[in-house]
Every structure is written in structure tokens, then in C-alpha cells.
């Protein structure tokens, strides 16, 4: 059971390093110092409660179910890899998948908040993608809103009898799109359009992101289904443990 997980996690980290060390344009994360300090503070304050709950959940998970550590590492590596696959955008910045849907479905949205924040902090400090002052805003969109959307949508799909594969696809895809809708809102609030205000600015940012992000979201959804099927083939024991704890949904 553990060898396939170790292989995937190792492959994910290797691919991530290759992409991370390659030259690239600015990442989609809001860069350091870009937001006015007032808005940077607001997003930090909104993000922190989710992070603290997530830290508590991670500590409890590791204490009660240490067997799932490798699965947690896999979810982290999956997020690292997908968020490193940067594609140039029409704005001169870049778009990328988020990879938060899988972890949210396995461990719940709050544990995924911690994983996503770790990814963002690593990128900010070592790769100059995003920033420390804007970490609250970036984490709120990618590590809070995205996982919550994935978890809630997956729950609703299963409640209404949608197949697991379709549910996973929709959850991962919408987690990606929700992240960039939130980012568009953040930028629009900080930099409203001179004539059309916040709504006009939001439409501009969202339409620019949509050019690359919609295809990426669909691709991420399909890839998440592939990984989900792999886990259900080779890691049934770990998934059963999570299901018994109530962290994952069948």
C-alpha cells in the first residue's frame, strides 16, 4: 500500500522541483507589496481563524491516525506540483492549477488550509511567487475558499446521487475556478475601476483570468479523478481509516 504512495509523492516532488527551478514569469499569486496595507491586513485577519482550526485538525489527525501521514504527504505534493505548472497569461502574468480539491476531499477543507498555506509560504520565500504581506490574501483564496467550495460541492453531489467520479471532477474544477473568482474580488476591492467601480474591475480581472483558467480547471478536474481512482485501487486501507474518522467522503 505504501510503496505506490511513496512513488507518487516522490514523483510529484521531483516534477515540482524541475518546474520550480525553471525560468518563469510572475506567478498568479498576488505579489509582495502589491495590495494596499489595509487590504493585506483584512485578508490576513479573515484567513487566520481558518488556519488555526486547520492546525488543530492536523495535530488531531496525526495523533489519532498516524497511518495516513504518507497520504497527507501525497496531497501536499499534489498541490505543490499543480501550483507550480505556470502557464503565461494574456496579462504578462501566469495562470496555474491549484491542486487543493484532492486534499479537501481526503482530509476536509481545514486541513487543506494548512497544506495550501505551506505551499504558498514555500513559494513566497524560496521562489519569489506571491509574498509574505499578501500571504493572507493568497491563502484565503487558494487555501480557504477553494477547499471549502470543493468539500461543499462534493457533499452536495453525493447527496443527490451523482457518481463519485463526476463529483470529484466537479469539486476539483470548481475549487480551482473559485480560487480565481476570489482573487478577482480581492483585486477589484483593492483597485476599483475609475468609472465602473468594483464590479467593473472584477469583470476585467475575471475575464482575463478566465482565458487560461477555465481550461486549466477542467484539466485539473480530470487529473484529480485519475489520482482519486489510483488511491482507491492502491490505498483502500488509508482511505478506510479516513472515512472512519469522518475526514473523507464516499
UniProtKB/Swiss-Prot annotation:
**Annotated localization:** Cell membrane
Please indicate if the UniProt record lists Transport as a keyword.
yes
Membrane topology, as annotated, equals:
Multi-pass membrane protein
- Which pathway does the protein contribute to? Cofactor biosynthesis; adenosylcobalamin biosynthesis
Q: What is its main location?
A: membrane
For this protein, the parts annotated as crossing the membrane are: 33-53, 70-90, 102-122, 134-154, 168-188, 208-228
Signal peptide span: 1-27
GO cellular component terms listed in the entry, alphabetical order: ATP-binding cassette (ABC) transporter complex
Q: Name one GO molecular function term.
A: cobalt ion transmembrane transporter activity
Q: Name one GO biological process term.
A: cobalamin biosynthetic process
Q: Which UniProt keywords apply?
A: Cell membrane, Cobalamin biosynthesis, Cobalt, Cobalt transport, Ion transport, Membrane, Signal, Transmembrane, Transmembrane helix, Transport
HAMAP family attached to this UniProt entry: CbiM
The entry's family comment says: Belongs to the CbiM family.
Per UniProt, subunit arrangement is: Forms an energy-coupling factor (ECF) transporter complex composed of an ATP-binding protein (A component, CbiO), a transmembrane protein (T component, CbiQ) and 2 possible substrate-capture proteins (S components, CbiM and CbiN) of unknown stoichimetry.
Which purpose does this protein serve, as stated in its record? Part of the energy-coupling factor (ECF) transporter complex CbiMNOQ involved in cobalt import.
Protein name (Swiss-Prot/TrEMBL): Cobalt transport protein CbiM
Organism of this sequence: Anoxybacillus flavithermus (strain DSM 21510 / WK1)
Q: What is the lineage of its organism?
A: Bacteria, Bacillati, Bacillota, Bacilli, Bacillales
What gene is behind this protein?
cbiM
